Amino acid sequence: MLNVENLHQYYGGSHILRGLSFEAKIGEVTCLLGRNGVGKTTLLKCLMGVIPAKEGTVKWEGKPITGFKPHQRVHAGIAYVPQGREIFGRLTVEENLLMGLSRFSAKEAREVPEFIYELFPVLEQMKHRRGGDLSGGQQQQLAIGRALASRPRLLILDEPTEGIQPSVIKEIGAVIQKLAAKGDMAILLVEQFYDFAAELADQYLVMSRGEIVQQGRGETMEADGVRGLVAI
């Protein structure tokens, strides 16, 4: 389980994250919703150690990781798919996926795990194509596949539907549901697309101005008025 307690972050004179506390449990999809500029991506960067937290603690599977560097968090079983995907455009699809195996020994990192191609068949069909030649939706699938290649216990996704065609959004949603159903991974999904989040969420969190202003179970999102809270 991911446990975040009283997390604060500042940027210049601005108080970006204001005492955030929440949990993301193994076997559940925790959806974090909020409008642009409320601090969602800053929170994820703190969780991955890209930006150090100024105050508060982050624990993963009972152990404090607040002081861990990003690569240490990867080795602890945490994977992050950022906005913009950050794939390697000049590398092939297969080479991009092999990059996700960097936390394993050379012997274990020789081949792309078969389960990646089972989740995303298009990646196997295009494994010799350069990443930069893929469509936006295919690049997003590649970015998620690369993250999953590290066999994480916590998968963090930052707005995976942004700029993606509806058919691929459905495919990504189906993959997230499959991963959650296995029950051995916590998934933290940051999303602005309400319907996508509502379909997947076991737990929801709503951020506004650096604070979590509402939280609850996914099945009560509509009754709790979450759609109105995140409407742009």
Q: Language model features by range: what are they?
A:
Residues L33-R35:
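The feature captures the beta-strand-to-loop junction immediately N-terminal to the Walker
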Residues M48:
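Helix-to-loop junction immediately C-terminal to a conserved catalytic motif
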Residues G56-I65, A76, A109-F115, Q214:
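Conserved ABC transporter NBD signature motif
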Residues A147-L148:
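ABC ATPase C-loop
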Residues R151:
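Conserved catalytic motifs of ABC-family nucleotide-binding domains
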Residues K170-G183:
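Helical segment within the ABC ATPase nucleotide-binding domain
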